[in-house]
Regions:
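Long amphipathic alpha-helical segments
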Residues: 1-64
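Short glycine-rich anion-binding loops that position phosphate/pyrophosphate groups of nucleotides
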Residues: 25-26, 101-102, 153-156, 176-178
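N-terminal loops that bind phosphate or other acidic moieties
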Residues: 33-39, 51-53, 63, 73-74, ...
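Glycine-rich oxoanion-binding loops at beta->alpha junctions
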Residues: 72-76, 82, 120-141, 186
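Glycine-rich phosphate/diphosphate-binding loop of Rossmann-like nucleotide-binding domains
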Residues: 88-131
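N-terminal small/polar loop signature for handling phosphorylated ligands or for N-terminal nucleophile
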Residues: 130-150, 156-157, 161
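Glycine-rich phosphate/nucleotide-binding loop
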Residues: 157-186
Length: 186
């Protein structure tokens, strides 16, 4: 496709295929990109997309899956991840934490993306610092994680609180939900 330069070998180089950012692309462009990827035997993952795009892509491959809350379309038919057991992160357990329920779509995007790459995920949602007991009551989940992704918009303090409770990497993802100083977030 003249409008897109597809990286068909990313899976071989990196252990996971190229991800398509769906926002701003027309359905026709996404159809052309998906056809090119399928023709080369690649897995498909489209982020920030819609059910309308999914319904169109089902005509190309009925095995497509739509994760509505995460806004992701996926098709996994290769075993690239399983063929690369030497990648240490595959044994990790990622915990995705959300501050509030309005942060869940971004948290689900992180969770589904991580799962697509063959990494185990647990979810811990609606545990923002306004009700800190909800987080502290689940400290066993925090301690069991190898990596924690914290998605929060309203207060922006959750990632700092979590990082003070654990000795593993904490990835902070700000969202545009709620009010306060998080600004526009993801």
């Amino acid at each position: 496709a003249a409008f897109a330069c597809i990286d068909h070998h990313r899976g071989l180089r990196c252990g996971f295929p190229e991800v398509i950012f769906g926002a701003g692309k027309s359905i026709e462009e996404l159809v052309r990109i998906v056809r090119l990827l399928i023709d080369k035997g690649n897995d498909i993952m489209i982020t920030r997309t819609t059910k309308e795009v999914y319904e169109t892509l089902l005509e190309i491959d009925s095995c497509m899956v739509y994760y509505e809350q995460a806004r992701i379309i996926a098709l996994k038919h290769t075993q690239i991840i399983e063929e690369l057991p030497k990648i240490p992160c595959l044994k990790a357990k990622v915990l995705v934490v959300s501050g509030g329920t309005t942060d869940i779509p971004v948290a689900e995007e992180a969770a589904v993306t991580t799962e697509m790459f063959g990494i185990g995920v647990e979810r811990l949602y609606d545990v923002g610092v306004a009700g800190i007991h909800r987080l502290l009551d689940r400290s066993d989940k925090l301690r069991a994680a190898s990596v924690i992704i914290v998605v929060a918009g309203m207060e922006g303090a959750l990632a700092s609180v979590v990082s003070g409770l654990v000795d593993v990497p904490v990835i902070a993802v700000p969202t545009s939900s709620g009010y306060g100083l998080g600004e526009k977030g993801v």
